[in-house]
Amino acid sequence: MWRSLVIKLLSIVLVGCYNAADKPNFSTTIPEANTSIERLKEQYVGNRAMFIKDEVVVRGRITSSDAENNFYRTIIVDDQTAAIEVMVGLNTLSKSYPEGLLVALNLQGCYVGESYGVLQVGRKAESYSSYDVDYLDSREAVDIVIRRSQDVEPIHPIDLNICNINKSHLGRLLRISDLQLVYSTSIDTLAGETLHDACWRGYSLYKNSSGDSIAIYTRNYASFANHTIPLERLSLTGILQYGKYNGAKECYQLKMRYEEDCQPY
């Protein structure tokens, strides 16, 4: 696919691809990991931020992208054991931290929390905040945490059936197939709108042939938010989250990166 070609080209020109407002450090060598994201996740005790006082380094590849604005000021890093969301706090991250880039995360001095079931790292949130952690507050702070290599490779999602999803997959890039749209918060049924009028923004609910369901969440600011959802059976790719569907029942949700994360089944 064209995106794989773009990723290969990025691996060649990465050094010069950022703009003057966003100059991350990069290196041909980055620190080795001394633990895994899975192990870090096991150590985290939910419902409170955890301070990392010791030297903790994890390595992985970026699986998210803000290129189409469905992700905002964060990156997801996956080391093939688990995934973690870095609260970067900068814009247009896909230019400097593209999908498939190998990075090392120096987590000493950071706080670890959780949001929508996904492990997060950043600075400690204010006491009045409803979140565990907040965005890193400067370019310098970001450069301390994220060490960027020049190694970019295509990312391949994990193919799963809905019935096989569990909490170990939270934060990871999944592809779920045989999905049919059954509900969307984007339509007003009282006004006579139907699923033929549904667009991506908000929540949409899908079922497979076995009747298992999964939700898709799309930000209103995503570039494809107002594009019509295909009504054929689909394969959908995205980062797995867990939270309230349309403010009600909690369930697994996918958050797509690009509109092309939706493909015919």
Predicted feature descriptions by range:
Residues 1-7:
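Bacterial N-terminal signal peptides that target proteins for export
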Residues 14-16:
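C-terminal motif of bacterial Sec signal peptides marking the signal peptidase cleavage site
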Residues 18-104, 108-265:
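OB-fold nucleic-acid-binding modules
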Residues 7-8, 23:
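Short helix-onset patch at the extreme N-terminus, typifying the N->h transition
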